[in-house]
Amino acid sequence: MYQQEEYEVNNEGQEDVSKINALNLKWTLGFNFQLTDGVHNLTNEKRKEIFYPVAHTGVIYDYENNTQRLLQGHCNRITATAYCKFSDIIVTADCGPDSMLVVWDASTGIPKKTIFEPHPNGCQALDISQDGQFIVTLSKEANTDTDVQSLSLWEWNKDDEPCLITNEFDRRIKDYQYFVRFNSDDNTEFATTGKTRIVFWRREGEQKGFNYYSPGNIPSLKVLTQTVFIPDNTQVVTGTTDGHIIVWDISLIIEKVDTPKERRAIKLVDLMNKSKKPDGKKGSNSINILKIQDNYLVIGSSNGSIRFYDFQYRIIAWFEDAIIGSISNISFANTPMIEDNEDEDGFDDERKDKGENEPKFICPDFIVVDLDATITMLNYKLFEELDDEKKKGTTLMKSIVSPIIAMSCRPNSNVIGICCENGYLYEWNFQEKSSVLSILRVFDTDKENIPNCIDYSPDGNWLSVATKSGKIHIFDCKEKQWQNSVLEVSENEQGKPKVNMQVFSSDSKNLATMDADYAVSLFTIDHRQFDVNIPEKEWQFVGKHRIHHSEIKSIAFGESKNENDKKYYRLFSIGADMKMVEYEVLEIDYSKQKEKGQQINYIDRLKLKSIYPIEQETIPTACIWYPINMYKEDVLLTVNEEFKIKLWQFMKDNFKFCKKTCLGPIYGGAINKLLILNQNDAQNDYQDKYLAYSTKEKVVGIIKLPLEGNPNQTMGLIAHPDKITSISCSNDGKHFFSSGSDDYCVNVWSVNVQALEQIFATNPNEDPYPKLLEGGEDGQTHQDLKNFFYYSQIRSKDEHTTKARKLDGKVPLIAIPDMMRSMGYYPTNKEIENMQNEIRFSKYLDPGEQVEELDLNMFLKLFVNHRPVQGIGKSKIAESLNTLTKSLSDSAKEIAEQAKGQSVQPKTYNIDGIGEISLQDLKKILTTEGERMTNEEFDECLKILCGENEDQIPQQINVNNLCEDILGFEDLEGEERDDNIEDQYEDEENEEYDQD
């Protein structure tokens, strides 16, 4: 147990710029196709580029040269973007903690302005004025039903305070606003749109607020989408989900004196429910997108139609032959349009002959983005094109359309595999960087055959796809065909457990899986039907064990050598039950098949070897076979939820112990995935190596091996804004890959080994460990640590003697527990054993001796690496106490049911609903379970904590008296109170609201 006030965990995942240079983002696959108005056409006379957001990164993509410029800086997913053609600037914003609003130079990709926390929770939507001077932002609220939105106007290029006005919405509006748009003729006016209401805003002079009003005469049952201002006109148009537009105009009726002119709905026009051409697209016709391009109102619909109308709402042109899904954006190039005098086919002459005096339809090239993750380029001439194939336009990008489940890089190639929730399995060449993915297979999601993890074998010959229904599909990468027989981890037809992880052995001949039923299974490639006379080989099931009684967190193969120096494989699993299970992988000698009377068990090749508890208070999260093997050791590396990395040594006599415990990276949460970064050098026992890791969300990083407990030998950065599903790397370690989930993104990173070494290089004259203490090297904690160590030296030399003592700067290992407790860290007996073994066997395998003493530096390393990162607080004690009371309650009910045949609910909660336990029950638990105390030790501790007076000892123990009266903890965890209680309005849905 360890109570600590000031030691904090850095969950930001942010490192120095030099550390980020060690992992450079080189390419990002995918884009946020669901973000309305998120993609912009940057094409002009000098460039052919588009901008789109990917997770928390902006991308300027040159579709002519297939290159990317990456705009990095956001730590949350980008939720709003805008582009100003006049100023050639891009605006991006995100929502979440540490949100930002960034203005980028579109020609260079360099940020021109960064505004931190434009709103407390970031931006829902934004727009930029026609001249690029002003930005308007809508806040994103955590609870869209109860929280009040705000709207801000920014003059972003001001050197001082850029925010001009911030205004909260009137609670009576009762409609969350999703969209905002400037009036292109007047940058003091803009409109916001929700599902049922539109609000018009105007800034008057330099006053500190807005005039706004929300018209109430919206046609019933209309769900609104977007709003645009008609140029050189007072009319405004709002789209609806049923294919209509609502036309707003200045009201001619003055309702009361001094009421400003306000827009009212003057008509409802059906634009999309009737096709304007015989073979037009049918189906749902929601108006998703409204744009103004020159003299046209442009509409993009949910059925993939693009239509151009004049400002009398008469159709001029339509594009309905391209294979386009529900549209999320339309964006036009910034190129001057010069109408040809005559087409190649003489079309203009034909128009004149027919007496058509209307100007010919013309517009810049434009891109269309749909919800099928496709970006299509269209040209205005396609409207009059007769060839159906040519009318489909040019596909610039066809990307990932479903959340990513898993990703893996194929060794000895430039291909990565990606599987998604919709059952699609893709392959993508990261050297060619194609904008269109290659589909390897589509799994039938109706049969719950959705892939859950994919992995290539180390030799690159096999691809294993494990599904949520317990099936394993094997793909032969050389022959380009799937194995006919499908492997299964369970024969029970009623419930097929989901395969959560799979791993190949280093020789690519064994495949191990762990599933949701807490079982570990083994498959191997062997002769069909295990008949040596059949030359064909296939993957087959050869063993299974269900040892864990809780979720398995990770599995790993290890390599060892027997007495004959022959290599064999062992398999390890770690689980939420805090246990490590070791299995031996048996090999079959087919020469015995011919021996008379010899019976061979071809199936049972996974032999249970040992079960060992590796944690007491925290859950292990990942494991990997330790690749550093200078002394021919067998070592497994594990990590846990408390940010600790442990090395477990396996001796020849099946003896195992914790060789070392190190503080791991503490940014971004606990590590849940590990891999060797430079796998080509994995067999080199002496070369420095690197472990790549990922946390459950946001952070990936690198750990330098061998582990020394040096905090300078780890780095991490924000790779994704949310969940990370997979990490992988190329065999040479030069490319590292990470995949998100519903950000539809795979990031390709280049690894700079030289930069890594510069990062991890430690000044020999600088001790990094004191910096991990509160106050650093000159702080009180470091001084206390030295004082307690020196006092331990005196005690070890007999503190009561009057003779001169000769201190040699070392203390015996038996002094470790008292020194740790004096520093406020109360280790368990097992933790004490681990610390003593770490010192005792630190030199054992080199000269063959055991170390029985430690110096000050050793003690400092032990303390910073073993103590809990987060101290024990009242909430954690309450959680533990509730666990005990629940356990007692369940036990009492079970006893009562057995004795009387009925359930009895024992009293384990007081009148305030706080879990409590009697003093006698607490004593029984502490003296009979876990690391047991004796009765005398319990009584002695209670007297020390509560005093000699037995009346001061409470007979019922709850979290309050245990923490405050017995343990003397300070209440460091303040409770949050919401004192901001505002009145609620209950107004009619169509009531109008004004503010002057």
From Swiss-Prot:
Outcome of gene disruption: Knockout cells show deficiencies in cell multiplication and ciliary functions. Mutants move with greatly reduced velocities, have disturbed waveform of beating cilia and have stiffer cilia. Mutant cilia lacjk an arch-like density of the radial spoke 3 base.
InterPro entries, per the entry: EF-hand-dom_pair (IPR011992), Quinoprotein_ADH-like_sf (IPR011047), WD40/YVTN_repeat-like_dom_sf (IPR015943), WD40_repeat_CS (IPR019775), WD40_repeat_dom_sf (IPR036322), WD40_rpt (IPR001680), WD_repeat_EMAP (IPR050630)
Keywords: Cell projection, Repeat, WD repeat
Top-rank taxon: Eukaryota
Subcellular location: Cell projection, Cilium
WD repeat locations: 73-114, 118-164, 168-211, 219-258, 282-319, 399-438, 445-485, 494-533, 547-593, 615-658, 719-759
Segments of this protein annotated with the region Disordered: 971-996
SUPFAM superfamilies: EF-hand (SSF47473), Quinoprotein alcohol dehydrogenase-like (SSF50998), WD40 repeat-like (SSF50978)
GO biological process: cilium movement; cilium organization
Transmembrane regions: none
SMART domains: WD40
PROSITE patterns xrefs: AA_TRANSFER_CLASS_2, WD_REPEATS_1, WD_REPEATS_2, WD_REPEATS_REGION
CC terms in the record's Gene Ontology section: 9+2 motile cilium
Function of the protein: As component of a spoke-associated complex, regulates ciliary mobility by mediating a stable and functional assembly of the radial spoke 3 (RS3).
Protein name: Cilia- and flagella-associated protein 251
Species, as recorded: Tetrahymena thermophila (strain SB210)
